UniProtKB/Swiss-Prot annotation:
Species this protein is from: Mus musculus
EC supergroup of this enzyme: hydrolase
Lineage, broadest ranks: Eukaryota, Metazoa, Chordata, Craniata, Vertebrata
One BP term from GO: response to UV
Regions of compositional bias (Polar residues) in chain numbering: 1138-1147, 1330-1345
Function statement: Essential factor involved in transcription-coupled nucleotide excision repair (TC-NER), a process during which RNA polymerase II-blocking lesions are rapidly removed from the transcribed strand of active genes. Plays a central role in the initiation of the TC-NER process: specifically recognizes and binds RNA polymerase II stalled at a lesion, and mediates recruitment of ERCC8/CSA, initiating DNA damage excision by TFIIH recruitment.
Region described as Essential for its interaction with RNA polymerase II, transcription-coupled nucleotide excision repair activity, association with chromatin after UV irradiation and for mediating the UV-induced translocation of ERRC8 to the nuclear matrix: spans on this chain: 1434-1481
Name of this chain's protein: DNA excision repair protein ERCC-6
Primary gene name: Ercc6
Record-linked SUPFAM superfamilies: P-loop containing nucleoside triphosphate hydrolases
Annotated region described as Ubiquitin-binding domain (UBD), given as residue ranges: 1387-1416
Stretches for region Disordered: 309-452, 1040-1096, 1114-1238, 1307-1372
Family stated for the protein in its record: Belongs to the SNF2/RAD54 helicase family.
Cross-link Glycyl lysine isopeptide (Lys-Gly) (interchain with G-Cter in SUMO2) mapped to chain: K256
Length: 1481
């Protein structure tokens, strides 16, 4: 044992600075090496803050230090100069002790610690450098291989680029890719040199194995080149990212986390740990005894007061109910007066403001934040901030008690704040008991106190440490150490094992991606779909940083582990973040910078304290703006924006405030990173990675404008292709920094139930229709259209009328004010005067009977009030939350609804209840009115369909047909398509609808025969839930020449009618806007067509002139998806002929009549419609005669409202026009059959009741089921057809004529045209860079297997192998190689250099076939020999022959093949004839 003595008597307070515990620590304490960094032992001795988490005890420091690792650092006292014996104090001389000067001793100890740290750091750095060097070598090899492959492509394309403009564009793109690879190679080389310098050059110069570079290596990632030449690999790459198996940087997630045993603890610390555990156990027992005594006393008091409370409870409840009813009635009168004032306000000229701003309807702020539809405004953010600030004062008195110690709460619970109960906030039926017993009663359950109070934080941390020690002792006794093995990543990053193993696999991948961003000193957008646990991924990553104790390079190494972190989020979810942090990683000190926080002193001091202790500060977007100077004064390690799309306006004050943090570590969490336009995406990316997308003007000019313009219906082919290329480049640029997984991709991991989302088009009531039409015809709208008035007020008025006419007109008897004794129907806001409320009434009645629970969202608080009155009148239990609900009250309401299953409805405004709120207690969602911003409605939907939901979720979006709401829905779809084009699929088809100002102020009244404008736009997408139409039935019967019983049509008409849709080109679509709606409303035009019918419906093209095309004919692609619309562009095409319209309308008349007249149960119709219609379409001559018929409906009455109702399941349904159903209905699991039947029952009841349901649309089928853009598909089909024809022409030239008597090569036998063995090709002038196949080397079985397995048996395109190595292993016609070469014109043009050269080498070098060769040969042979007239065939003959042979994917190619193979003309009788061209006869 040694001693240190300090002779300096002038500092007596420092005499005992080294107690025995610390002296032992000097001597024996291990200095742990973790990940290349050695902790400073001196800090543990001189500070009370433990490096292992934010513990505050020195004992915890020692405990943490002993866990660091087995490496020990012994302090060598002999290296520290001691005080000479002659210089020692007299009383110490002769005692034989060593005396040290304190300053010298501390300096010596620190020098030894620093030296040890430096040595350990060097060792770790070398180890990391060696590991990183191996990775660099792999990257270098991969990059070099890619460059060689690209050079081969350039060599193949260069000779043809001068003569072929298409190939020239591809060559330019490949050269750009080569430039990118060269830049990447430079960076890799520089990194290699840096690592070589670190390693000292010893054994580092590893020569690249050139032979290995010739092996088959894949590209390191998808790119623009991959988008064009490597579709198969790109799809696989994106699928791995979407399903959470790989990060965007290409790092795959390990299949199974390696179990690593925990390091054995040192014996020196075991006794100390036991002491801590004993003390903790004693303390726990003492507190338990005290708590038991307090509980007993409290129970006596409660039992005495419970009797009196029970006796008065009934009287109190009845009193509150009557008071609430009076308040509701008073508020209704107030809304009536505001409605009258609003009517005058609508007509104000532009530039003038209302005289009384205080009477501005409150719903406007909630409703029209995105009215412009294209770009957000400062008003939206400012409005939310004002809302937060306004309610903050209401909640300050009520909240402060919650976050104080428990003993102070009892006093505060008795206080009922007067500010919360005003004219704008009404407690629901479930809140009234709480209001009488004390407003704070419910908050104790859900609210989680933050760590603003440091004493509370220390107490909570001690509890957590005690529990950890107890749990660890249990594991040690059971010898179960492997369960907590940490998850280790590159460069020493570790996540605690108990935390990491609780994450889903895709969440683990998200943590890995966040670490990759951290290493690159870059930010990112975690854009997982709402409800996939973005919060948990962030907490796990931050916990890993704190746990790993890694120095951050980008912060000058000033932060060890995790530095101060700030999280900005909506006020509704601030305390939800606190709860999640305390649950998943309690060591963090998490404080809320807001009025609802527990910190009672100055906010500036709280910020300073959190920065000092490296804690987590949670605040709102309004506080970021208000306290910008105080917050940005400090250096923050991480800045995280929850619901980061709040900064989508690049010029807003809150956006500029968020972008002033001095840190590269910026993370955005957003389930909808792009909502309206590309300008918003730029704003988000400029926050996480400033400069990545350049400046905003350049980005808008080079990317936003081309991509947006290419998405409109009237875009030219050049604009469409330009938009595609720009979208590819933009997607490749942002992909590494945007991680987005969808629920549909990770559904199996989450075990999420199914979601059924439908759009119910509701008919206006007579009163609504009258008010709507009167307003459209008014002078106010006239002034808007002339530019004299602002459009904003007019749109607000239209939306109010759609919700409820009383919101605009003030209701009946508004002149004299509503009397007290008025009739129920004449009350303000009565539900029978609104078409959508009639539907809501029926839905709620059915769901209440079924025991479902409902979320009811509305944009407007005024509408929410009317719905509240409606719920109270029908005696439904409910809760309500809107902008006036205090921040402190929101989380308790959410918790109460999730836990109390007796509450039926939760009323919410979309903006308040749509962000970060978890309402999985509900399984039915009604979105009462749409928002211009599609993500707003999506956020509301995701409140129920998220992790934790166990039941199937049904979502109904309510829209009024033919009104402004339908236009809003169209705008939502356009924005969603634009988002998909950038984030998902650059080939996303265009949205075939563009509104102008005049269209917004129109009203259409679609009936059963017309359908809605939406049904016309999205015809063929498989979204329509069809219902028969009596008007259409009569018309088609007349066209077909049949009686009303829908007897068998003439056999000759059936294929001819189909041929009209299939081959004959209508002159235009503008005149068929309505007829297409009716013509495609039969079962075959939806998602129930057979493959043959669907393929044939778009397969052929009968042209009236040589220059015409079939673009607009592609109403439906081969898989039933919408490729182009015949209803949109009314100006670009000539009018339609009457005969064509009739034929289109009657194409499937037989099947439609069959559907009308056959009574089938609804479940059978939904499940088995596909097979039924398939058989009926092909054999309608026999089956339609035997089907039981129902009588025709009666003649239409004078009242058009009632005469146009359609029939469903044989029953007339009021207000029904048609119904759509989800096209993948038949593929759902059998386990969801009960839920589906429940939804079907609801729809059936809606159609049977006298409700305002007009039609039903599947929203998911429109958003997710869209096919690629028609122009891109047609261009691809044309290229494939041209290549196939060239291959056929070359093959024909190789065959001998009939006079030779030589059999033609069949693949097995024959001589004529058979390729000879591969000749020695040395000395030839042509470039022989492609493999040659000897067909005789492949048997038929082998060829069939290769066709099925595709690329499994074929070499990769970028294989790098020599040509001779693949002589006998050439790919089949169905392989990816053949498709890529055919698509990029890398084979055939060089074989057409000259006829002589081609004839000389035709036998030796056969053309590389495609998968359409057999189809082309069959078509040619049929038309040449098997039709009624050799050499030509009618459309009907072609249909009958190939209808059953065509697959869905072959439809477009088949049409192009036919048009290139034959010439088309019509006979005098109108029959279409296809005649072989001379070169193919």
């Amino acid at each position: 044992m040694f001693h240190e003595e300090v002779p300096n008597s002038t500092h007596p307070q420092e005499q005992d600075c080294l107690p025995s515990q610390h002296a032992n620590a000097y001597k024996d304490m291990p200095v742990g090496q973790e990940n290349g960094g050695v902790s400073e032992a001196g800090e543990c001795l001189s500070s009370t803050s433990c490096e292992y988490g934010p513990s505050t005890s020195a004992e915890a420091c020692v405990l943490a230090a002993t866990r660091r690792g087995p490496t020990l650092l012994h302090i060598d006292r002999h290296q520290i100069p001691a005080v000479e014996p002659s210089a020692q104090a007299l009383e110490l001389q002769g005692l034989g002790v060593d005396v040290y000067d304190q300053a010298v001793l501390e300096q010596g100890v620190l020098q030894q610690v620093d030296s040890a740290m430096h040595e350990a750091s060097c060792v770790a750095q070398l180890a990391d450098a060696e590991k990183e060097y191996q990775s660099v070598l792999d990257d270098l090899m991969s990059c070099t291989t890619s460059l060689r492959q690209i050079n081969k492509i350039i060599e193949q394309l260069s000779p043809q680029a001068a003569s072929n403009r298409d190939i020239n564009r591809k060559l330019d793109s490949v050269k750009r890719q080569k430039y990118n690879k060269e830049q990447q190679l430079k960076k890799i080389t520089a990194k290699q040199k840096r690592l070589q310098a670190i390693l000292g050059g010893a054994g580092v110069q590893v020569e690249l194995d050139h032979a290995s570079l010739e092996e088959d290596d894949a590209e390191p990632g998808p790119s623009c080149l991959g988008s064009m030449l490597m579709p198969a690999q790109e799809t696989a790459w994106e699928e791995l990212i979407r399903t959470g198996q790989m990060t965007p940087f290409g790092t795959p997630a390990p299949q199974k986390q390696e179990k690593k045993p925990r390091k054995i603890m040192l014996n020196e610390a075991s006794g100390f740990e036991k002491y801590l555990a004993e003390q903790a156990q004693l303390s726990f027992e003492r507190k338990k005894q005290a708590a038991t005594k307090r509980t007993a006393k409290k129970a006596i008091v409660i039992s005495e007061s419970s009797r009196a409370a029970i006796e008065t409870k009934a009287d109190q409840r009845s009193q509150v109910l009557s008071q609430t009813d009076k308040r509701l009635k008073k508020h209704s009168r107030k809304l009536q007066r505001r409605a009258l004032q609003f009517q005058g306000k609508v007509g104000l000229p532009s530039g003038k403001k209302p005289l009384e701003p205080e009477v501005r309807p409150e719903a406007e702020g909630d409703t029209e934040g995105e009215e412009s539809g294209s770009s957000p405004t400062d008003g939206e953010e400012e409005e939310e901030q004002e809302e937060e600030e306004g309610v903050a004062s209401l909640s300050s008195d009520d909240v402060s008690y919650e976050l104080k110690p428990l003993r102070k709460r009892q006093k505060y619970q008795k206080k009922v704040p007067v500010q919360e109960i005003d004219d704008d906030f009404f407690p629901s039926s479930e809140e009234e008991d709480e209001a009488m017993e004390g407003r704070g009663g419910g908050r104790k359950v859900a609210r989680r106190q933050d760590d603003g109070d440091e004493d509370y934080y220390k107490q909570r941390l001690r509890r957590w440490n005690r529990l950890r020690l107890q749990d660890k002792e249990k594991r040690l006794k059971l010898e179960d150490d492997s369960e907590e093995s940490d998850a280790e990543f590159d460069e020493g990053f570790k996540v605690p094992g108990f935390l990491f193993k609780k994450l889903f696999k895709y969440q683990q991948t998200g943590v890995r991606w966040l670490w990759e961003l951290h290493c690159q000193q870059a930010g990112g957008i975690l854009g997982d779909e709402m409800g996939l646990g973005k919060t948990i991924q962030i907490i796990a990553f931050l916990a890993g940083l704190s746990y790993s104790k890694i120095r951050t390079r980008g912060s000058n190494y000033r932060f060890e582990g995790l530095g101060p972190t700030i999280i900005v989020c909506p006020t509704t979810v601030m305390h939800q973040w606190v709860k999640e942090f305390h649950t998943w990683w309690p060591p963090f000190r998490v404080a809320v910078l807001h009025e609802t926080g527990s910190y009672t002193h100055k906010k500036e001091r709280l910020i300073r304290d959190i920065v000092y202790c490296h804690g987590v500060l949670i605040t709102s977007y309004s506080y970021i703006r208000l306290m910008q100077d105080d917050i940005s004064r400090h250096d923050w390690h991480y800045v995280i924006l929850d619901e980061g799309h709040k900064i989508r306006n690049p010029n807003a004050a809150v956006t500029l405030a968020c972008k002033q943090f001095r840190t590269p570590h910026r993370i955005i969490l957003s389930g909808s990173p792009m909502q309206n336009n590309l300008r918003e995406l730029w704003s988000l990316f400029d926050f996480i990675f400033p400069g990545k997308l350049g400046t905003l003007p350049v980005f808008m000019e080079q990317f936003s404008v081309p991509i947006t313009m290419g998405g409109y219906s009237n875009a030219s082919p050049v604009q469409v292709k330009t938009a595609y290329k720009c979208a590819c480049v933009l997607r490749d640029t942002i992909n590494p920094y945007l991680l987005r997984r969808m629920k549909s991709d990770v559904k199996m991991s989450l075990s999420l139930p199914d979601k059924n989302e439908q759009v119910l088009f509701c008919r206006l009531t007579d009163e609504q229709h009258k008010v709507y039409q009167n307003f459209i015809d008014s002078k106010a709208v006239y002034r808007i259209l002339n530019g004299e008035n602002q459009i904003f007020s007019g749109l607000v008025a239209l939306r109010k009328i759609c919700n409820h006419p009383d919101l605009f007109s003030g209701g009946p008897k508004n002149a004299s004010g509503p009397p007290e004794d008025e009739l129920e129907e004449e009350q303000f806001g009565h539900w029978r005067r609104s078409g959508k409320m009639i539907v809501v009434e029926s839905l709620l009645k059915i769901w209440h009977r079924q025991g479902q629970r409902v979320l009811l969202f509305s944009q407007s608080r005024q509408m929410l009030h009317i719905l509240e009155v409606f719920l109270r009148a029908h005696k439904y239990s409910y809760l309500k939350m809107d902008g006036t609900t205090t921040i402190a009250s929101r989380q308790p309401l959410i918790t109460k609804y999730n836990e109390d299953t007796s509450i039926f409805v939760f009323l919410l405004t979309t903006r308040v209840g749509g962000l970060g709120v978890n309402l999985t207690g509900a399984n039915r969602v009604i979105i009462y009115d749409p928002d211009w911003n599609p993500s707003t409605d999506t956020q509301a939907r995701e409140r129920a369909w998220r992790i934790g939901q166990k039941k199937q979720v049904t979502v109904y979006r309510l829209l009024t047909a033919g009104t402004i709401e339908e236009k809003i829905y169209h705008r939502q779809i356009f924005k969603q398509f634009l988002t998909n084009r950038v984030l998902k699929d650059p080939k996303q088809r265009r949205f075939f609808k563009s509104n102008d100002l005049y269209e917004l102020f129109t009203l259409t009244s679609p009936d059963a025969s017309q359908g809605t404008e939406t049904s016309a736009i999205f015809a063929g997408t498989g979204s329509s839930i069809q219902t028969p139409k009596c008007q259409l039935k009569k018309r088609t019967s007349t066209v077909l020449g049949t009686d009303p019983k829908c007897k068998k049509p003439p056999v000759s008409d059936t294929p001819a009618n189909a041929a009209t849709l299939i081959g004959e080109k209508p002159k235009a679509a503008g005149a068929t806007g309505r007829s297409v709606t009716s013509g495609e409303s039969g079962p075959f035009k939806g998602d129930h067509d057979t493959n043959g019918n669907r393929a044939s419906s778009v397969a052929f093209g009968e042209e009236t002139d040589a220059g015409s095309t079939l673009e607009h004919l592609s109403v439906m692609s081969g898989d039933g998806k919408h490729s182009d619309s015949p209803t949109v562009d009314h100006t670009s095409r000539p009018p339609v002929e009457a005969s064509t319209s009739e034929k289109q309308g009657s194409s499937y008349a037989g099947a439609r009549c069959q559907a009308q007249t056959e009574p089938v149960p609804m479940s059978e119709q939904m499940e088995g419609q596909f097979s039924k219609y398939k058989s009926k379409r092909k054999h309608d001559a026999s089956e339609e005669e035997t089907t039981e018929k129902r009588p025709q409906p009666k003649q239409k009455a004078k009242n058009s409202k009632h005469c146009r109702d359609a029939k469903f399941e044989g029953t007339r349904v009021p207000h029904l026009v048609k119904k759509r159903r989800y096209r993948q209905q038949t593929s759902e699991q059998e386990g969801g059959a009960k839920d589906r039947s429940s939804d079907d029952y609801v729809l059936e009841k809606l159609f049977k009741k006298s409700v305002g349901v007009h039609s039903v649309v599947r929203h998911d089928a429109i958003i997710d089921g869209s096919s690629p853009d028609y122009v891109l598909v047609e261009a691809e089909a044309n290229r494939v057809a041209q290549d196939a024809l060239k291959a056929l022409r070359l093959s024909r030239q190789q065959c001998l004529g009939a006079a030779s008597g030589v059999p033609t090569w069949t693949g097995h036998r024959g001589i004529s045209g058979a390729p000879t063995g591969v000749k020695n090709r040395f000395g030839q002038k042509r470039d022989s860079s492609l493999p040659v196949q000897h067909p005789s080397s492949l048997t038929e079985k082998t060829q069939n297997n290769m066709k099925k397995e595709g690329k499994a048996h074929t070499p990769e395109h970028f294989s790098g192998k020599e040509d001779g190595a693949s002589v006998s292993g050439a790919p089949s016609s169905s392989s990816l190689l053949a498709r890529m070469r055919a698509r990029n014109h890398m084979i055939l043009p060089e074989r057409l250099e000259s006829d002589s050269e081609h004839l000389a080498e035709a036998a030796a070098v056969p053309p590389c076939g495609t998968e359409h060769d057999d189809l082309l040969v069959d078509m040619r042979n049929f038309i040449a020999f098997q039709a009624q007239v050799d050499g030509q065939a009618s459309t009907q003959e072609i249909l009958q022959e190939f209808e059953s042979k065509l697959s869905v994917a072959q439809s477009c190619v088949f049409r192009e093949l036919l048009r290139n193979l034959c010439n088309f003309h019509r006979t005098p009788g109108g029959e279409g004839i296809w005649k072989l061209k001379p070169e193919y006869c």
